[in-house]
Design a protein with these regions (language model features):
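Iron-sulfur cluster-binding electron-transfer modules in prokaryotic oxidoreductases
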Residues: 1-132
Length: 132
């Protein structure tokens, strides 16, 4: 049922640090983001936030325990819906797709390391240091 290990392999080989959410919230026991079946619309916000609370709690756990600042998803609906839910439940948590994570990590020969992601947003950890 589904692809569980392949995305983890890609993520572990793309980012600096990888932490799993609690075991009872991942793989076959995962929680939905709460926005499937057309619920990713503004008028359904309260229902989306309630439905996404279990996922938000597991993200909050790794954020507080390990300082995780980004969650990567293979699901396009999660990628579209989680930023709003996590801004509410876990402020400051970034959301990316696995393909975005890989694209942002790729540095081709002769290319300088990126300071912004492919969307033009600052990459976490690559912000310019202010002059002291």
């Amino acid at each position: 049922m589904g692809l569980f290990e392949e995305p983890r392999y890609v993520i572990k080989n793309t980012c600096n640090h990888f932490y799993e959410m609690p075991e009872n919230t991942i793989r076959e026991q995962t929680f939905c983001c709460g926005s499937g079946s057309g619920l990713n619309a503004g008028e359904n916000m309260e229902l989306r936030l309630r439905g996404g609370l279990p996922r938000a709690n597991s993200v909050k756990y790794v954020h507080e325990k390990h300082g995780v600042n980004m969650v990567a998803c293979v699901c396009a609906i999660d990628r579209a819906a989680l930023p709003t839910a996590l801004d509410y439940w876990v402020p400051g948590m970034a959301v990316t797709g696995v393909h975005e994570l890989v694209g942002n990590a790729l540095i081709l020969e002769g290319e300088k390391p990126r300071e912004t992601n492919l969307r033009g947003e600052p990459l976490p950890g690559m912000e310019e240091e202010e002059d002291v």
